[in-house]
Amino acid sequence: MMIRSPEPEVKIVVDRDPVKTSFEEWARPGHFSRTIAKGPDTTTWIWNLHADAHDFDSHTGDLEEISRKVFSAHFGQLSIIFLWLSGMYFHGARFSNYEAWLSDPTHIGPSAQVVWPIVGQEILNGDVGGGFRGIQITSGFFQIWRASGITSELQLYCTAIGALIFASLMLFAGWFHYHKAAPKLAWFQDVESMLNHHLAGLLGLGSLSWAGHQIHVSLPINQFLDAGVDPKEIPLPHEFILNRDLLAQLYPSFAEGATPFFTLNWSKYAEFLSFRGGLDPITGGLWLSDIAHHHLAIAILFLIAGHMYRTNWGIGHGLKDILEAHKGPFTGQGHKGLYEILTTSWHAQLSLNLAMLGSTTIVVAHHMYSMPPYPYLATDYGTQLSLFTHHMWIGGFLIVGAAAHAAIFMVRDYDPTTRYNDLLDRVLRHRDAIISHLNWVCIFLGFHSFGLYIHNDTMSALGRPQDMFSDTAIQLQPIFAQWVQNLHAGAPSVTAPGATTSTSLTWGGGELVAVGGKVALLPIPLGTADFLVHHIHAFTIHVTVLILLKGVLFARSSRLIPDKANLGFRFPCDGPGRGGTCQVSAWDHVFLGLFWMYNSISVVIFHFSWKMQSDVWGTISDQGVVTHITGGNFAQSSITINGWLRDFLWAQASQVIQSYGSSLSAYGLFFLGAHFVWAFSLMFLFSGRGYWQELIESIVWAHNKLKVAPATQPRALSIIQGRAVGVTHYLLGGIATTWAFFLARIIAVG
């Protein structure tokens, strides 16, 4: 008797040659839309083309076709990423001082760009040490390359060429999986199989191969580099892999091979799979052996996780069952129906992924400085500041994107007729309570957090320092944060007896790591100043959430516009004759949310930049005396608004303002130019559409008089187009201004 699995053994999951490959459509801009394909009557056409080119929902209602387009576009995105990476590695190979930096990372700055000397631009190539003139880079690539065991510019060349090959492979895959073998909808909806492959394959085998590389290549090469061996003398990576004796000289347990593994005598491997905690005093980075251990552990977890979901064999978890079982006494139907939402609405799926990835990115920002993973990263202050700022901005944008796609899901994909009394429906039914409470929280946080600052400014102005909230007068110590710090500082002796140091030196415990006379990391003291600014963080984040959540919960309907769902995701007003209904679309909430996201992240990166310069970064004398860059002025200066303006913004802007005539002058120009871009945005944000239409008609009249009128009729931007252009320039200008301000400052003083 034969027992067959209920599933057929082979599922045909692709369609062959579904879409003919043809370049004819490339010559027809807007081929995806009947109206746009007709060509331009007015200048609005070019804006509509940009708005809808990637909105696959508007091209077709067929979910399978939309899925294939998204899938194919992902390969295009990967191709661009590989191309960008290839460019980075090529710059390292062709234009950088990587080999010089590798031999003396404490005295030589990383540089991978040399500006050609056209009309006196020689000034931009500053002296980064070791006789090399170029632009100091702050991307952290040098530190990553050293950690991964790259010892020569030839290796960077080879990697750059490899990345180019991968880029072309990805381009090919994008074409192949749309035109030649396109997956069926069922393949995109097979979530258990997807989970197994992504968890076990991408994360599990990915981490395992990285752990293998770190153990067999990175660790031995970094051992030699730390010992001061000339990079040219170090054996090449493949020699360590092929010749076990080489490794056994550095790590004696390698001679025993896999025996300790199978005899469960795992402690033998502790010399290269360590559990130390803290930082390597030579490089100021995490112990590479700790990192290898971490990736091995992660790999095992994800390899197990990748075998948990039910596919062809009828055992394991089914996601639908898990979601439908997920209900409590107060949650009605719970997550019933969520499985159907997430397998038919890619906006809902994307929204969740963006929210999680955005939060993770912000967590990464905080770990990059508190647990610096790469050698000589912690003492490269410019790179530390850049990495923190970069990851904070990216995280902020991703979280706003999560709200945007949640709202698009609500408008386009949500079906209220089939959803009753599940969690989403229950949230929507008491959305008034949620939003009004959240609004109260925002008002409370706003008045109280700013109230503390205004109190301090007033007392300071009246010469009454004894009545201020500060560490030396009325203390508002962050006792809960300090408790968390102490808990973690004490953990090695209690919850993690194998570790010699806590996870991060920032927790406390008095230990300091300095590399080449510069502070890598030390315990970060928290006081009244941090308590104040943390409540500003709470305020700005809650307002951002209020705006975005209101946009999602009221995306389909509101008391003001009950039929909002019929108007779509973005619309200017609810038609003529209904005053006071403009700027209520879900799109407008995303637009407003972006400004508050910008507020939130700006305060965070300002706080970080000043706090680190004041209390962490600096030099250490032979006697062990630490001199911080701004001499610890954060605790007393940042407790007033005036202090932020005077001692942070103004005092630290002197480097960028005075950069003309120096190798930092490009930052001075960017500072000026980005201010201009930012100011340009206000023209779009503060003026109405009719104003521009009147102006345009005057100008068209003049063109007609001169008989040079264009065939395409000029039109003012629509309300939404104008706001989109405005917010784009506002954010671009603001972020680039901050970038120039930060880098000119930290490169000059760091």
From Swiss-Prot:
It comes from the Eukaryota. It is found in: Plastid, Chloroplast thylakoid membrane. The keyword Iron-sulfur applies. The chain crosses the membrane at residues 70-93, 156-179, 195-219, 291-309, 346-369, 385-411, 433-455, 531-549, 589-610, 664-686, 724-744. Its EC number is 1.97.1.12. P700 is a chlorophyll a/chlorophyll a' dimer, A0 is one or more chlorophyll a, A1 is one or both phylloquinones and FX is a shared 4Fe-4S iron-sulfur center. The keyword Transmembrane helix applies. It catalyses: reduced [plastocyanin] + hnu + oxidized [2Fe-2S]-[ferredoxin] = oxidized [plastocyanin] + reduced [2Fe-2S]-[ferredoxin]. It is a multi-pass membrane protein. Signal peptide: none annotated. Chlorophyll a binds at M683, Y691. InterPro entries: PSI_PsaA, PSI_PsaA/B, PSI_PsaA/B_CS, PSI_PsaA/B_sf. Phylloquinone binds at W692. One of its GO terms (biological process) is photosynthesis. It is an enzyme of class 1 (oxidoreductase). Keywords: 4Fe-4S, Chlorophyll, Chloroplast, Chromophore, Electron transport, Iron, Iron-sulfur, Magnesium, Membrane, Metal-binding, Oxidoreductase, Photosynthesis, Photosystem I, Plastid, Thylakoid, Transmembrane, Transmembrane helix, Transport. Chlorophyll a' binds at H675. SUPFAM superfamilies: Photosystem I subunits PsaA/PsaB. [4Fe-4S] cluster binds at C573, C582. Disulfide bonds: none annotated. NCBIfam families: psaA (TIGR01335). HAMAP family: PSI_PsaA. The PsaA/B heterodimer binds the P700 chlorophyll special pair and subsequent electron acceptors. PSI consists of a core antenna complex that captures photons, and an electron transfer chain that converts photonic excitation into a charge separation. The eukaryotic PSI reaction center is composed of at least 11 subunits. This is Photosystem I P700 chlorophyll a apoprotein A1. It comes from Oryza sativa subsp. indica. The gene is psaA.
